[in-house]
Structure formats: C-alpha cells, structure tokens
C-alpha cells in the first residue's frame, strides 16, 4: 500500500507517476481493500484520505521546497502499515524519524537518506540507514559498490517531466531501465 501525493519539490511525484501508468487516483477509501485484494497493490492518494490537507497543496507547490508535510505524510498513512521504508532528505532526520517510528505501531522499518541529498536509496554513493526491528534501532550504510553497482552522477537520475518519468518507469517494469 503506497500512500502519496503529487509532486511538490520535484517534476513528478508518486501520484503523478502512477496516474501516468493508468492507476486511478480518485479511489474512494472504501474501495481500497478490494483493489488491494485484486491487484496486490493499492495507492492511497493523500487528498482523498486527508481532505483538510487539500488547502495546503497549492501553497506547498508555490513554495516548491520540502516542508513538514513531506515528513508527516508517511507517518499518517491511513493503512497503518506495520512495515515501512521511509526516505528523508536530510541526514540528521534519519535518527529522529527512526526513533519516531520505533515509538509507534511500526514493527519493522528502514529510514534512508541517499547520497546526493535524496530521500531514497540511490546509486550515487552510500545511503545512510537506520533499521527498526523489534523495538531496536540499528544504524547501517548501503553502498552500491558492495553490490557491484558503479556510482553514477545526479544527471543520470534526473527526469524533467511527468511523461519522462512515466516512460522510465515503463522501461524499468519491462526490464529495460536505465543504468542509474
């Protein structure tokens, strides 16, 4: 179950990409279980589940920078997952968010800060991580070189539009994705 929104600080957010792949965003909360059972995947479009946040969307887009809502979103996933992968855009947030998850209903999680300032694992270099399991925090690093992956540069990861991001995703799903 993926919980997300449209792009705010990038050219394509998870909702934009999934919409481009043909996933409907206007799914009513009561239909999510059926979709999950049918497809083994469901996308929870944040504005459908948190109507009061709709008012801040235009302000966030106008600001064009990360805000508290980037951190809050994964923490208020209405599916209340017990396992989660959470990316943060600043290294000092890894431990803070890991501790927050440790004190919640989460049983197992990874909080990641990717090389290059990304809120996800990247092939740019080592990813700082904190694993939460059975109430314990374990710091670790994930280096692409350890898996035979040569680091790339940020330009190789960049997409400049929603349509480009969707094309890249389609190629990845077809087994023809880019190196980075």
Predicted regions and their residues:
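Substrate-binding N-lobe of the ribokinase-like
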Residues: 1-26
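Glycine-rich anion-binding loops and their surrounding alpha/beta cores
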Residues: 19-26, 31-180
């Amino acid at each position: 179950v993926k919980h997300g929104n449209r792009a705010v600080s990038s050219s394509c957010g998870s909702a934009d990409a999934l919409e481009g792949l043909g996933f409907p965003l206007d799914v009513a909360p009561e239909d999510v279980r059926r979709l999950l059972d049918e497809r083994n995947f469901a996308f929870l479009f944040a504005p459908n589940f948190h109507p009061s946040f709709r008012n801040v969307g235009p302000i966030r887009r106008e600001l064009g920078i990360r805000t508290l809502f980037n951190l809050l979103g994964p923490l208020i996933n209405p599916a209340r997952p017990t396992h989660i992968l959470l990316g943060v855009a600043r290294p000092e947030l890894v431990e803070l968010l890991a501790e927050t998850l440790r004190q919640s209903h989460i049983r197992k999680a990874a909080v990641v800060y990717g090389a290059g300032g990304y809120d996800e694992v990247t092939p740019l270099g080592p990813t700082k991580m904190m694993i939460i399991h059975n109430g314990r925090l374990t710091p670790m690093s994930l280096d692409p070189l350890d898996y035979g992956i040569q680091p790339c540069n940020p330009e190789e990861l960049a997409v400049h539009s929603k349509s480009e991001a969707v094309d890249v995703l389609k190629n990845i799903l077809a087994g023809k994705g880019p190196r980075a």
